[in-house]
């Protein structure tokens, strides 16, 4: 557990990300894929039901012993809240109401944010669009760990701690890599979320509030679903920047595992990404992919060649248009 990883820097590359070229090739060969570029109305009802489910859980846990509050937060609430963050990811791509009703998606994202307890849906949208446009770009893509993370979390034990603390790094990393001015929508998001948290505490008590926050922190840390954070872009095979996952947890995560497909076609809702793979099978079947996020987490911690430095990084060329 004390061996240092062999990597001492990111994998600097001088080529463009592969997704734009593959998207052009696939659309030229299979133009019918354009018919999948439309919102998913079912997403709206799924998100509403998830919010109502957590509201019911807040009520149930208010009188439980503390041990059951924490157990429930990890065993049940964490799955709902992590899944909700991926629902917010779908909403960030305007998958709920479509591009023509962009603001409806922003308001709905704030609604979906409520049971998570921490305001982030508006900020996430801004940074996530940069992640797609400028994948791996130094000083722009905040999905890339900081140099400190790569330098410090360099043993199996430290990488294990890094996995546990993932939600904190995702929350604070943008402030160090690519800080942006606060927008009025972020203020509204924050006011709405803080008001909701206060109401939960006032009407249901501290246990419900702790359950909500613990479900988010535990669900985004050492949790099977959190394997997607690492599986998506950490370079387990040299030269491969994005990896898909085709295991059963896609059922809980809006098919976020179909990540090559998602980066190739970010305006196609998650529910249709398996169809993209089916139509253009020759483009995806031979790409390296995963079937277990748990194994990804284990390999990340135990493999001395993998660390937070295991990301492809590039100096962005030309003028950037940031969200």
UniProtKB/Swiss-Prot annotation:
GO MF term list: cis-trans isomerase activity; retinol isomerase activity; sphingolipid delta-4 desaturase activity
Transmembrane segments: 41-61, 68-88, 107-127, 152-172, 184-204, 209-229
Subcellular location: Mitochondrion membrane; Endoplasmic reticulum membrane
Reactions catalysed, as given in the entry: an N-acylsphinganine + 2 Fe(II)-[cytochrome b5] + O2 + 2 H(+) = an N-acylsphing-4-enine + 2 Fe(III)-[cytochrome b5] + 2 H2O; all-trans-retinol = 11-cis-retinol; all-trans-retinol = 9-cis-retinol; all-trans-retinol = 13-cis-retinol
Primary localisation category: mitochondrion
Tagged with keyword Isomerase: yes
Keyword tags: Endoplasmic reticulum, Fatty acid biosynthesis, Fatty acid metabolism, Isomerase, Lipid biosynthesis, Lipid metabolism, Lipoprotein, Membrane, Mitochondrion, Myristate, Oxidoreductase, Phosphoprotein, Transmembrane, Transmembrane helix
Residues with Phosphoserine modification: 307
Membrane topology: Multi-pass membrane protein
Positions of short motif Histidine box-2: 128-132
Motif (Histidine box-1): 89-93
Lipidation (N-myristoyl glycine): 2
Post-translational modification: Myristoylation can target the enzyme to the mitochondria leading to an increase in ceramide levels.
The enzyme's E.C. designation: 1.14.19.17, 5.2.1.-
GO biological process entries: ceramide biosynthetic process; fatty acid biosynthetic process; myelin maintenance
UniProt-listed InterPro entries: DES1/DES2, FA_desaturase_dom, Sphingolipid_d4-desaturase_N
Motif (Histidine box-3): 259-263
Task of the protein: Has sphingolipid-delta-4-desaturase activity. Converts D-erythro-sphinganine to D-erythro-sphingosine (E-sphing-4-enine). Catalyzes the equilibrium isomerization of retinols.
Family listed: Belongs to the fatty acid desaturase type 1 family. DEGS subfamily.
Subunit structure: Interacts with RLBP1; the interaction increases synthesis of chromophore-precursors by DEGS1.
Protein name, as recorded: Sphingolipid delta(4)-desaturase DES1
Annotated gene: DEGS1
């Amino acid at each position: 557990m004390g061996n240092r990883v062999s990597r001492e820097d990111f994998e600097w590359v001088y080529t463009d990300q592969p997704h734009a070229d593959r998207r052009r090739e696939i659309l030229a060969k299979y133009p019918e894929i354009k018919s999948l570029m439309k919102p998913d109305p079912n997403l709206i009802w799924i998100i509403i039901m998830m919010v109502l489910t957590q509201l019911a859980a807040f009520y149930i846990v208010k009188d439980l012993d503390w041990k059951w509050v924490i157990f429930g937060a990890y065993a049940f609430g964490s799955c709902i809240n992590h899944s909700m963050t991926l629902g917010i990811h779908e909403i960030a791509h305007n998958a709920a109401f479509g591009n023509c009703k962009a603001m409806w998606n922003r308001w709905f994202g704030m609604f979906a944010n409520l049971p998570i307890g921490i305001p982030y849906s508006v900020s996430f949208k801004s940074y996530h669009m940069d992640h797609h446009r400028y994948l791996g770009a130094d000083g722009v893509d905040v999905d890339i760990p900081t140099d400190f993370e790569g330098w410090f979390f360099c043993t199996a034990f430290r990488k294990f701690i890094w996995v546990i603390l993932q939600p904190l790094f995702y929350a604070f990393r943008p402030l160090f890599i690519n800080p942006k001015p606060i927008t009025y929508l972020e203020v509204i998001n924050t006011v709405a979320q803080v008001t909701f948290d206060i109401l939960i505490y006032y009407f249901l008590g501290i246990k419900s509030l702790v359950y909500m926050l613990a479900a988010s922190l535990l669900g985004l840390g050492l949790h099977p679903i959190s394997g997607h954070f690492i599986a998506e872009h950490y370079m387990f095979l040299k030269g491969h920047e994005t990896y898909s996952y085709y295991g059963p947890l896609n059922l809980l995560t809006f098919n976020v595992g179909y990540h090559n497909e998602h980066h190739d076609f970010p305006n196609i809702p998650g529910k249709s990404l398996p169809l993209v793979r089916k139509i253009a099978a020759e483009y995806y079947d031979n790409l390296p992919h995963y079937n277990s996020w748990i194994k990804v987490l284990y390999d990340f911690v135990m493999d001395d060649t993998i660390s937070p430095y295991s990301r492809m990084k590039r100096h962005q060329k030309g003028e950037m248009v940031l969200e």
